[in-house]
Each structure stands twice: as structure tokens, then as C-alpha cells.
Amino acid sequence: MPRIPTAEVPKEVLDYLFDEFDIWAKIHDGRLISEPIDGLPSSTWPNATAMIIKHFLPDGKHIATTHCVKDDSGHVFHWDTKDLRLHDVRLWRA
């Protein structure tokens, strides 16, 4: 499968689009299916795991990727945007 066109955008733009399209709300209320990729120990926070998480629509289409660092109790130390797919274009955080 060919790679989709990708445009680098500043973090502020990607954060704005996540807010504008309610991506965070959709992640938290379960409207998007979230699948973490195997995590690694965090280099910043002891006893925490850093994960890349892919977020999908119910039909299986990948629409966003985030980076999350949390501990075993579920406390989130850091969670930010990585990319957003709009139609057939990927917006990647520069």
C-alpha cells in the first residue's frame, strides 16, 4: 500500500486541530478505538512507560497517533499529539 502524502505542521497547529475536531474527547469517551504499541520504560519519569498509541474510527480507519507516558496505576505524566489524518493526507508534528 503506498504511503499517503504527509505534511509537517507545527505542534501548535496539530494541537489546535485535535481540539477543533474534538479528538481528545473522542479518545476519552471511547468514540475512537485506541491501540497502544508496545511501550518502553520512560527515560524521564521513573516507573513509567512511554507508549505510542494509534486511534481508529469504529470502521478501522486510523485517524490519529499520540504519545503517552503513564505509570502502572494509570497516572498520566505526559500525553501529546503525533499525527492526524484528514481524508488522504497525514499531518505530522514537526
Predicted features by range, described:
Residues 1-94:
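Catalytic toxin/effector domains delivered as secreted proteins or via bacterial secretion systems
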